[in-house]
């Protein structure tokens, strides 16, 4: 399936990418079976993002970042606390009514307590997997925070989580959710029909632009075949006029799009009706 080409009549729509954390790593740590490429290893930067769709009508938050406790435990370098980032953008998390969890890894599903009034949308496959014994195996469990999973399960019991069964779902007219898998069993990508063309929020279906451009899978995966298929889907979407893709962790995102605050260009970038980037 391809994303809908029907573009809603939103007032002043924008997609905001918030850079809330960073760390230094290496190619051999980031890319699956890196030695197969017969290249020298090299240092890389991994940035951590969450995303916001905002118009005059609605604000939707996509993923929630890692918690302060997780940052300390995993030696990640916070750039801005997600709560402070929202405040800088003029967003009160209590006013957020709709929140998407693309997957349940610690760096995407912390801080859910910031959003007491949000209905949370995620893949049923993703939700159910992390409640299984397999999800607790070390190679899977390393990437989640058990406290996040407990909170997600509690929110589901409270009726605040909507679980999606279909591979494609309309979040609201103009925003489609696609279950691509690969990185995790229910990894989702979000496609926003902006006036200039679709904005593909790949989340961790791709971490870096290199994955798409060099067909180079990330090291953390549930299904290698599904990861490759996800790349193929995203490449198809990129054939559409004006389409842009936002990977889940590539610092180059901050160079490709216009800063929200010119005095602090490392804080956040935006894609809006004035152009897809710089």
Region spans (language model):
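Active-site metal-binding loops of divalent metal-dependent hydrolases
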Residues: 20-21, 64-67, 104, 125-126, ...
